[in-house]
Amino acid sequence: MQREFLLNLFKDCDFYELTAENFEELVIEKLPKDFSYKYHFGISKVCIIPMGADYVIKIPFAGQEILDDLEPYEFYYEDFYSANDVIGFSWDYCLTELLYYNKAKKRHINKCFCKTRLLGFVNYHPIYIQERAITFRQKNGDLDYKSEKSIRMEKYCEEHHFRCFDSEWLADVFEYYGAKTFNKLMSFIDEYNIIDLHTDNIGYIGIRPVLLDFSDFAG
């Protein structure tokens, strides 16, 4: 993985007022034709997955298109403003992930998160790189049953006043890391109010359970 090579992939991209509505035109269509990849996106960022790589590239959106209440079928652009407290980057939800990862590192629970770092800037826009993981949904589908360990985990979370957002995955976390790290992770999630942890935002690197999208969203 070469930093300059990866950054150069985006040299022709336009990041001005980048949103979930326009990123395909401004970014995806500008990528080199011989670059093989897949991509997924949400409201705050796009995740580009180079074929065969053990990492993903994340690009934050700057804002979103808002439906105008006064003009039917008309939209206007609005910057994100609540991603973090960093002056000049309060719109950047990928930076939020990097900040959380660094906080987790100080508490020795960073292995519970996909390693995240800033790759660099292209046309004044930040580009991030993150360990590649498989999502819980990709690995397990939509489970329609509860295992015994899942039921035990629900009880454990209730007894310790933890929010039990996916008991099957949490049971894997407990088994892999042990009670001490599990409790520290759950306290971290509660402290920073990381709520949006559905089955596409949690997953695994090999057998290691990880959070792979942990910026949450607040507008």
Question: Where are the language model's segments positioned?
Answer:
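Juxta-kinase regulatory segment immediately upstream of eukaryotic protein kinase catalytic domains
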Residues: 1-37
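ATP-binding glycine-rich loop module of kinase domains
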Residues: 36-38, 43-106
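Short, solvent-exposed loop/turn segments at secondary-structure junctions
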Residues: 62-65, 121-124, 133-137, 203, ...
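Active-site Asp-x-Gly
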Residues: 67-76, 154-161, 215-219
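Protein kinase catalytic-loop region centered on the HRD/HxD motif
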Residues: 184-193
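Catalytic activation segment of kinase domains across protein kinase-like and atypical kinase folds
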Residues: 192-219
